[in-house]
Amino acid sequence: MAELGLNEHHQNEVINYMRFARSKRGLRLKTVDSCFQDLKESRLVEETFTVDEVSEVLNGLQAVVHSEVESELINTAYTNVLLLRQLFSQAEKWYLKLQTDISELENRELLEQVAEFEKAEFTSSNKKSIIDSMKPKLAPLHEGGAAELLNKEIIRLQEENEKLKSRLKTIESQATDALDEKSKLERALQDLQLEHGSQKDFIKAQDLSDLENTVAALKSEFQKTLNDQTENQKSLEENLATAKHDLLRVQEQLSMAEKELEKKFQQTAAFRNMKEILTKKNDQIKDLRKRLAKYEPED
């Protein structure tokens, strides 16, 4: 079913709107007919009329018909605005920006094709594909767009997690080196202290001062190494926290998207495919959380 170049669901929505418009149009035409009928019954009771009387009757009829037609045109315009508002509101929920081509509203060929479609839809049970070639058409929106965006976000987080894991290995290596250096410094300090204890009776005051300076320098270097290690550990914790927050945010977006998609497409054939995709993405996120949990710092 592709008479309008739309999928079945959207084409049914168009048919519903055309049915609504036909109903409103029929009511308004009945109102106009009643204006003429009222005129016949209330004013055309004499055998003859003067020119002034005929002019008065026609002017009154013109005013009534003008008011009815104007009211219908205004109401139609407002109705179309409300319809556009519904479409744009739904699009904005998915962060989409729709565009309209006003010039196409006066395309005589397209208008005639729509008229033929209405005629075939409402006057015949045998519908024909008469508008397959109607151009231009809006580019179709992929029903999986939301899931695709979430998938890209998950892939980005996975790549970022790999980078964090690589950085964690580097920091762990640096921490190991720092601990080795610390052990070496402690042993050197102990050796100096032992040497100082065995030779304290023979070392001059200047030599003792030099030794104390050396010990102080070693302590300072050791403290600097510990500070660097602390800063690296803090940076790692911040990165892990950021990744965790991003993961929670994506999981929330995925949950909202799943609920919205279930609501929007639970009557369509695409629902089962979308449900399967969302389930796989949930499994990927659970796996990602387990992998991130391995690198969270212990309290």
Curated annotation (Swiss-Prot):
It comes from the Eukaryota. Residues 145-299 are annotated as: Interaction with BSS9. One of its GO terms (cellular component) is cytosol. One of its GO terms (molecular function) is identical protein binding. Pfam families: Leu_zip. Keywords: Coiled coil, Cytoplasm. One of its GO terms (biological process) is negative regulation of protein localization to cilium. It is found in: Cytoplasm. PANTHER family: LEUCINE ZIPPER TRANSCRIPTION FACTOR LIKE, LEUCINE ZIPPER TRANSCRIPTION FACTOR-LIKE PROTEIN 1. Belongs to the LZTFL1 family. This is Leucine zipper transcription factor-like protein 1. It comes from Bos taurus (Bovine).
